[in-house]
């Protein structure tokens, strides 16, 4: 282990040493670049772009490009990037993570690698955690730096229409949020008009701000485009009515994992309540699903901690557990959101199914090069390396850190802890020192707020309930006498600047109300103080009644704290390295567990990723192709050849003419397509291979039908383009129809696959095998349905106008028994699965 850590440490030092060599080359060009006139910068950019096209690499262009960007930043913003910011910029260009402490200028640092990589003509996306930050950089002086350099800059936010998004994505540099970027990707892969695509270039390079928040904290939260499903409102209400009758003996909560299940006594009670024999019978699967969601909603989900209730608009709002922000428009999936609505007595909205989905883990791995910035990534460097192939390189601060980080104060009860917190806060507030109080939940922030009101201490609250005032509150948090309560470091991404005279008072004082599951979040809170060499102070107040202690320490930690207080000089508060280490050990355990869980989920999600890429790549080829007729013909030929071959090999008499005609006309062709005498002649000709002959004959029928359909449009020049559009539209709609069903099938498979462990089988291997079977079955159905729909479709009747009306596809839900049984066999998937 020591050798492994030593190797990592040495590799980090080596990367920094190489970065210094490059940064020195940048500095050597500063005097030369400073002689340029303002108008020369855009000219220089054009020259560098030309050099790249002529064969120069970005690494070769880096020193001059960075020197230009640095001088441009100085002229436009009045701020000169420090040497350490050049180091960070080099690390970003190399596709790694630059860990830069709060206030060290990550915003300016990103300009240099963004400018350099945009010289290639490929898209550069600078990704922020919220729209406020994206707009601030685009509209402000940072965007002006790029414009000064002759680069185009775009902004991508959810209020932009399709045309605005298309223009933004064509810019050299795009400022965007992670969520909007991901949803645009999903929406693009549901488009049926190529002209509507917003991202028409490859995903080349992304710089992710607060990279740990997006790629670690939000990794488990998939982006989902939903569709309405069959209503089951009454089941939600009945399930909620049932759980309200339960006592502690009826259910069991696992605190560490926050899972809940009915006990045997609870199962019996459910069966009596719903008047059924066996809750776990397959016929009661929907009821069981609703009961489980009702249990989660009632006993593991807490208002003002996991979600907010907006009674005015009658809706449940998710609280981001890592930022404390509300997430309007987002829903808990799989019916949990509706269960919470039932719990809170709100109108139950329609449950949704998945139309398209992707996780941030898999979305950001689409980029050819990925880099990121944050003040807190070192604790998660193993995950960044394993999942994203990025190293975390600590960038030294420009000025030494002088913040004082005091040991934790520890208490037995929450009351003792809060009393001590208010005591210290009051003492510091009296001398005018600004104070930032960090909480882990909205609920705790409001408890602290009530206590401050009792002491007549004016303060601001920054949590999910008032996130709209975030920038305004943070801007004032460093002023004299300011007291700010922030949940899970809401306000991250905006510096807290000290007001006049605050340095003399000791700078910003940060008081944490408890330890978070992740050391990173604690470090983010501490990092709000002591920016750029400013003085600062931080201390955490923890108790044995804190959630982290309750989940992992139990009564053991309470006994330890009680013992320490007895031997301490203070009656209540005391500090102990042993207890601090104990909590740190818990945090490491949770972090390791969360990492393992994210890896576990990623392993499953990678199966869907491979399938999604196959579908989306083939779909896009069809969408943008101007040769869709040829694509469709090739697909039909292979589909028919396969079907005919299967029919021949399954028949004792290989060419039963009437049976063959009936089979093909039922499955693919319009009635009376085939002539019985012609088919008999083909089958009975001793000089030819009847299988090959009939395959060629049937494909000629395909070409004849397609030509007759096309002839209908050729008669009217205004409608000539509709034939190709019609083929494309039908093909894409069928792909989407089946793929969306497949996503939900895979979701159901994932939820149910855990039960195979009872049969001593590996659940992942079983998921992989059955997922491949589902995928191959879907591919076959897509090919069959495209062939049948187009051959049987009457363009003359239905395509008098462009194809905007709904086409009703063949219902393929009535599978034969063999396809209903999931089989485990090796499945091969290709880049063009149905070709």
Curated annotation (Swiss-Prot):
This is Protein translocase subunit SecA. ATP binds at residues 85, 103-107, 495. GO terms for molecular function: ATP binding; protein-exporting ATPase activity. Its EC number is 7.4.2.8. Residues 820-835 have a biased composition (Basic residues). PANTHER family: CHLOROPLAST PROTEIN-TRANSPORTING ATPASE (PTHR30612:SF0), SECA INNER MEMBRANE COMPONENT OF SEC PROTEIN SECRETION SYSTEM (PTHR30612). It comes from Aster yellows witches'-broom phytoplasma (strain AYWB). It is an enzyme of class 7 (translocase). It is a peripheral membrane protein. Pfam families: P-loop_SecA, SecA_DEAD, SecA_PP_bind, SecA_SW.
